[in-house]
Amino acid sequence: MIEELINKSKKIVIKIGSNTLSNDNGTINKNFLKELSEQIIYLRDKGKQFVIVSSGARIAGVSTLGKWMRKEDMNYKQALCAIGQVELMDAYRRCFEPYNVFIAQMLLTRDDFSDAHRRLNIRNTLFTLVDEGVIPIINENDTVSVEEIRIGDNDTLAALTTNIWNADLLILFSDIDGIYDKNPKEHEDAILVENVMNIDELLEKIEVGDVNEFGTGGIATKIEAAKAVNDYGIPMILANGKKENILLKLLEGTEKATIFQAGK
């Protein structure tokens, strides 16, 4: 089922969460990025188009300037993101450069999606970049985002991007295999929910936990993202980005994940 869904999808948004992107010590997992770029290039050669929504600016900032890691002042947090965003994009650039593929940075806030003119500019830029073979890499603009204009998490940003680009599929990479009936890190008997037809019914049957360690989104935000794209008729896959060659394994049907089916 997953392989069929990916096979028939041309326009794919991939969201990479902080926990997926980071090593256990909090640094950027550059091996993951290298592996991901190889898989994306392979699928691009088969006619697929990609937009990436990537967390990780703060992680990259901490890796670069660790002495600010424990500072709680918002100014320092935003400054870390400003430093880290440069490092993050450089890591992506280095991964795609051997294939002569360019990347483009897009930093957005909620205001950009709320204003019709800005929203149109986002859409036009996305279409232009992708049509010209460039891979857009999107993140929230943390350096200017205060509470009033924050999108809040990149699961939501990925859903907004998916809808505005009219994508065929959203894939969220996290550090778990999908949605479970209860937290698999705390319960060995947790059962993976592989196919979700009705999100409201799902919520009656599962336990929704808290936010993750590095990022701002937990299972609740992933379910909200699924609902947002499903309402536009777009399916979503939640999969474990920590697994080796996960994108190709999903395509081959050799890894399990959760599919949120779009309503008919």
From Swiss-Prot:
SUPFAM superfamilies hit by this protein: Carbamate kinase-like
Pathway(s) it belongs to: Amino-acid biosynthesis; L-proline biosynthesis; L-glutamate 5-semialdehyde from L-glutamate: step 1/2
Q: What is its main location?
A: cytoplasm
Q: Which Gene3D superfamilies match?
A: Acetylglutamate kinase-like
User: Which keywords are on file for this protein?
Assistant: Amino-acid biosynthesis, ATP-binding, Cytoplasm, Kinase, Nucleotide-binding, Proline biosynthesis, Transferase
Subcellular localization is given as: Cytoplasm
PROSITE patterns in the record, alphabetically?
GLUTAMATE_5_KINASE (PS00902)
Which InterPro entries does the record match to this protein?
A: AceGlu_kinase-like_sf, Asp/Glu/Uridylate_kinase, G5K_ProB, Glu/AcGlu_kinase, Glu_5kinase, Glu_5kinase/COase_Synthase, Glutamate_5-kinase_CS
Q: Give the CDD domains listed for this entry.
A: AAK_G5K_ProB (cd04242)
Report the EC number(s), separated by commas if there are several.
2.7.2.11
Question: What's a single GO CC term here?
Answer: cytosol
Ligand binding (ATP): 15, 174-175, 216-222
Instruction: Please tell me where substrate binds in this chain.
Output: 55, 142, 154
Q: Which reaction does it catalyse?
A: L-glutamate + ATP = L-glutamyl 5-phosphate + ADP
Please cite one Gene Ontology biological process associated with this protein: L-proline biosynthetic process
GO terms assigned for molecular function: ATP binding; glutamate 5-kinase activity
EC class of this enzyme?
transferase
PANTHER family documented for this protein: GLUTAMATE 5-KINASE, ISOPENTENYL PHOSPHATE KINASE
Instruction: State the protein's purpose.
Output: Catalyzes the transfer of a phosphate group to glutamate to form L-glutamate 5-phosphate.
Q: Which family does it belong to?
A: Belongs to the glutamate 5-kinase family.
Alphabetized NCBIfam families for the sequence:
proB
In Swiss-Prot or TrEMBL terms, this protein is called Glutamate 5-kinase
Q: Which gene encodes it?
A: proB
